[in-house]
Amino acid sequence: MTDEKQALVEKIIKDVHNVLSKTAELYAFDIVPVETNFRNKSPVMCIENCLGLESWCVKQVYLHSYTELMDKACFQTQKKCRQVLDSETLLRLLNVTLLINPDLSVLWNKRKEMVQELLLDTSSELKFTRLVLSRKPKCNDAFSHRRWILGTYLNNHQINYLESLINTELIVCDLTADKCPNNYHSWSHRLWFINKLKNIIKQNDMHALYIKEYNFSERWMSKHVSDFSCFHYRQFCIKNIYNLSNVSWKTFENSLDINFRKVLVCLLAKNFPKDRTIQASEQDLVSYSEENLMKFLLSYNNSCSCNVDSVSLCRKFELLCYELTLNSELLRFYKHHESMWYHRRFILHEIIEMMYDHFGLFRHNGVLVKKSCKYCKTTDLKQKQAKIIRSHGDCLYKSVLFQVIIKHEKKFIQESEEDKHAVRHEKYLKLIQGLNNLM
Amino acid sequence: MSYSTRNKFEIARFSGEEENHINKKLPKELLLRILSYLDVVSLCRCAQVSKLWNILALDGSNWQRIDLFDFQRDVEGSVIENISHRCGGFLRQLSLRGCESIADGSMKTLAQSCPNIEDLNLNKCKKVTDHTCQALGRRCSKLQRINLDSCPSVTDISLKALSDGCPLLTHVNVSWCQSISENGVEALARSCPKLKSFICRGCKNVNDRAVSCLATFCVDLEVLNVQGCDNLTDDSISKLGGAMRRLCVSGCTRLTDTSLCALATKCPDLVTLELAQCAQLTDAGFQALARSCRMLERMDLEECVLITDTTLVHLAMGCPRLEKLTLSHCELITDYGIKQLSMSPCAAEHLTVLGLDNCPLVTDGALEHLISCHNLQLIELYDCQMVTRNAIRKLRNHLPNIKVHAYFAPVTPPVAGGGARPRYCRCCNII
């Protein structure tokens, strides 16, 4: 009886292997809940490029393959194992065991060894991990195996199919993120992958990819409002957009159906401080050059003679203000979602940091400190630190942009009073960002 | 028994100092003789006993036949070099099956130091290339058996070198050496007339000319395995001679009934015939075959999709020695054919293994007929969806030792011990 049982299990393992090796476009695996089998029928199913295994045999198959691997694949160094599996049987067992239970790092490591010994093909490994992820989209071992494969693959090879490689990788991330909400592993894999590509593909392509990812994350974000992993990725995308070249920025602006400047001006116009007479109308602001706009908003002359890149600064503000309005809109639609409030914190933090940076200040232990100019490295040691900081700080706090932002936040917090996160947000701004006196 | 002269002096010196009785009572020649019966592991252990024993155990004469497969397979080249230096001319037989890190360098050393080797197994030594075979061809003229299974770098050059230098070759295995082609095989066939066994599974370039050469020049050829050589046609298979005992042409999809008829007339002593995936074969061919090849013991007819119950009728009548019959994926086979088979003379005594997986027309009735096959040990029924669990149980009642392979979940024995446990724990009982 035990012989027969073993034969059955081995036959099933062989069937699975046959499907795996014959069907190239296999994209999904799952265990089909069939508790009993009345008919003498194979529990291995292959329908429309999906692999299925009936649940009645899973326990036996797993037990057999797992013990076989542990006994014979030399995992215990203490026990000298006599029988050694040949590479094909080993692979067969590894495939089945990992499909059923992918959280076994030992087995993944064995696969890595096999890849290094050229017993396994990298592209087939990518396919296999994808199959595993189709069932367990949160399996970190599978993602890390994928990273390892891609890392060696991208470092060592001249890549011909880079484009398709990038596409499949992003698709895998999409699928896994879609299958399982708050899939941290998927998003961090995506982030790793984009970072990895930085050293490999040309800058132009990279910028195009940044734009694509920015747009993608916006769509995703508005559909998954409490997936902070996605928001984190969005923040990564925004930071990537900062670094776009002029040409890419143009294509970026064209690719969107919104005008950043208009959004920024709209935000400004709604929240202009009352006590000041503003000479500029909305149309004027829209038509201003970046330099003039920044002068108007920040009204600050740097003490040293360095040129500030007001174009990129202006772009960053535009980008962040758009993000802020987007976030406000989403918050109005979907109330009580903590992750969106956290994202808002990120946006405000970025804006405020950027202003500090522009004014040559930074926060150290909650106190503003003057720093040397990052371009010319001169420090005005003649004047007293405290005095400079006071004057610079005043300048900063009186600037139009700062006042507009503060006013906008105040309004928004009042507006969404019933949300307990709004109160927290206010506290965050007051205590963490140190705006207690200003709000 | 002789041992290397360079050690004689040392043996004399050490044996004088030894206190051990066995060394005093037995002459060195006898000790050496005793050691010669030991396997690799025991010899290595003996070599650690004393200096004398070390010399005796590692003497080349003990190492005429070495198989490292069960001992150690992650051997490096230096191990092989050591072995070849120690054994020298003594080495007759060496198996390095699965020693994947062995490369040409150490194999060259081996060829140089062990010219008398007769049987060399390099199965799965993936790094071995033509250089090894060239060295063997130059030095080892006594080589009779060589196994180069799964050495993908081996090409026609190897076969030429071997055929030039080793005229005594009888057994050659070059399976999965995909670059082997007609030229190499022809050279081998021409210069090694004693060839008895030639195995080239998965060598896609082996064609009709290659097999024709083997058939014409090697009249003693008994074993031919050309599994997966899908270029082969009836032309070459029809030329095979009367010495043929075991033939495997699985995967040669172009073969037709002509081959079977030719085999029937020319090779009446066939014992094993594997015809898997030869989908063009029909009942007519098997009728001719069954009439004359009465010694057939093993037949593999997997995926011969055209055959029907008629074939089984002919086999049942013509092949009284049939032991093992595989009919997987022969989708036209019905209970009637199985009934005929079970009534044949082979069924009662010889038939031990019967493969019926993926025969959708086979039902419970077939199993009832098979009850008369007393010797049946294994029956494969995977995916025969008309076969039920009850029928298998009945068959088991009649043939208690039979193994049935089917897709039914194994019956797990009821969990014992759950109800037998005392309701109170032991300490409560004591109190």
Residue ranges and their predicted role:
Chain B
Residues 1-25, 142, 401, 411-431:
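CRL adaptor-proximal regions
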Residues 81-85, 107-113, 133-139, 159-165, ...:
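A structural signal for leucine-rich repeat
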Residues 366-431:
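C-terminal interaction modules of eukaryotic adaptor/scaffold proteins
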Residues 66, 92-96, 118-122, 146-148, ...:
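Conserved hydrophobic beta-strand positions in leucine-rich repeat
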Residues 72-78, 100-105, 126-131, 152-157, ...:
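Short, solvent-exposed loop/turn at the beta-strand->alpha-helix junction
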Residues 1-111, 115-116, 124, 129, ...:
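N-terminal adaptor-interaction module of cullin-RING ubiquitin ligase components
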